[in-house]
């Protein structure tokens, strides 16, 4: 693994920390922290605090988590750093920062990345950043996890933390690509999805490509609303996106990468998503130019699925969700141009490895009940209860007649009914704000 990664993911690893109202379950992956139980009921609240972790000097840091959060549970991940800085009198000083939060996470809550500020450090949505000038750095951290349940019959579980960090050293320049390597990945355009969110779902579209390669059969909007950060009011929180992948059982994390680590993943059969900034206008001097790019963007996520050499020039093979159709998503970018665009995107990469635990998806079977034959109005039933179709609850409703090749988008009639002219051999997906997707097979 890259030298800028630190893992906590085994029974022995978790034992090094302090567990308050928590236990380590050896039957989940290689070990996972869960709430302790009393008389077969889980305690409502627990805290894990890691040992002090020594790292190389860093200015920025990411903490990813792999977890399961059943309905009624959530977790919050925090970090603090031991920071070296010069005080107002130019004296060298060392001090722990305050505990800062990467946010409250759960698959069935309104996730939020909001964090209080500190005079030494801050969290900017998904990055822990040391304040001050380039000489203000840290080399020690601790992480803390708060686990909570409102239903004492279930507990959240955390099976892995991954820390990635970077300093002020220059990024790694081009390295030799030994041979062509291209991984099959489905191609999805963000621009043919729900028109209300098409311009801002590059990240969940990329995550969906990576997961559907593994036959998860996810819908882009389903992924998007499962990653949505209600404080950031956006779908692009890096840590929330990989946390969603982990909620399906996958080992996943965000890494400050370089070409060496990108090559490591591709040649191990793992495509990755990366953060870039680029322009397709050669006269635009604000962003790095990429020939054949579909747009100009101040921040974007795409999938890297391979390397290729043609006529002596190295290329990366990508699935860029900014392509206007599924057929135009796969593209080849010159490696040198891609490097510059990726560097401007902080060299972020989403890494998704194999599934470590089996976790059921968040889909619930539903059925249709005809309410008005003349106007073809239907209610949606879930276990004999009518589903709320108001905009307060429903995020997106999709219908497909061709097994998901194409979708139409539905707006409920009067917040209560679906108007269906033709329900022959269709499947309807209702994505709720409760973290579940309700599926009607017509």
Residues covered by each model-derived region:
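Non-cytosolic beta-sandwich-type ligand-binding/adhesion modules
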Residues: 2-165
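Aromatic/hydrophobic beta-strand junction motif of beta-rich domains
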Residues: 63-65, 378-391
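Surface-exposed, short loops/turns at beta-strand junctions within beta-sandwich domains
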Residues: 133-137, 417-425
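Active-site-adjacent structural segments surrounding the nucleophilic cysteine of cysteine proteases
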Residues: 140, 146-235, 310
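Edge beta-strands of extracellular beta-sandwich domains
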Residues: 409, 435-442
């Amino acid at each position: 693994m890259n030298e800028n990664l630190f893992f906590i993911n085994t029974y022995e690893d978790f034992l090094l920390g302090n567990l308050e109202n928590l236990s380590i379950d050896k039957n989940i992956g290689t070990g996972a922290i869960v709430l302790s139980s009393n008389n077969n009921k889980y305690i409502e609240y627990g805290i894990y605090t890691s040992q002090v972790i020594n790292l190389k000097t860093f200015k920025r840091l990411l903490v990813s988590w792999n977890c399961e959060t059943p309905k009624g549970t959530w977790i919050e991940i925090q970090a603090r750093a031991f920071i070296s800085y010069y005080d107002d009198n130019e004296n060298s000083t060392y001090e722990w920062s305050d505990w800062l939060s990467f946010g409250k996470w759960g698959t069935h809550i309104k996730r939020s990345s909001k964090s209080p500020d500190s005079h030494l450090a801050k969290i900017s949505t998904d990055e822990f950043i040391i304040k001050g000038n380039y000489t203000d750095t840290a080399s020690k951290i601790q992480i803390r996890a708060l686990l909570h349940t409102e239903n004492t019959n279930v507990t959240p579980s955390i099976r892995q933390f991954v820390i990635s960090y970077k300093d002020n050293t220059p990024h790694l320049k081009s390295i030799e690509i030994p041979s062509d390597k291209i991984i099959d990945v489905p191609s999805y355009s963000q621009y043919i999805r729900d028109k209300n969110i098409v311009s801002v779902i590059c990240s969940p579209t990329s995550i969906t490509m990576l997961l559907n390669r593994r036959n998860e059969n996810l819908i882009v909007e389903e992924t998007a609303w499962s990653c949505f950060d209600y404080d950031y009011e956006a779908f692009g929180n890096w840590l929330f996106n990989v946390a969603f992948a982990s909620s399906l059982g996958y080992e996943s994390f965000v890494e400050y990468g370089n070409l060496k680590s990108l090559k490591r993943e591709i040649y191990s059969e793992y495509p990755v998503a990366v953060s870039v900034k680029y322009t397709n206008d050669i006269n635009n001097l604000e962003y790095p130019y990429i020939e054949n790019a579909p747009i100009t963007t101040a921040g974007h996520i795409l999938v890297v699925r391979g390397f290729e050499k043609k006529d002596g020039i190295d290329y990366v093979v990508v699935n860029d969700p900014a392509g206007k159709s599924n057929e135009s998503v796969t593209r080849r970018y010159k490696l040198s141009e891609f490097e510059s665009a990726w560097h401007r995107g902080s060299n972020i990469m989403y890494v998704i490895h194999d599934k470590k635990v089996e976790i059921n998806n968040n889909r619930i079977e539903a059925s249709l009940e005809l309410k008005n034959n003349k106007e073809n109005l239907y209610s949606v039933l879930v276990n004999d209860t009518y589903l709320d179709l108001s905009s307060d609850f429903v995020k997106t409703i999709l219908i497909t007649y061709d097994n998901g090749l194409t979708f139409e988008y539905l707006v409920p009639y009067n917040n209560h009914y679906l108007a269906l002219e033709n329900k022959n051999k269709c499947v309807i997906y209702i994505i709720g704000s409760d973290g579940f997707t309700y599926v009607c097979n017509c």
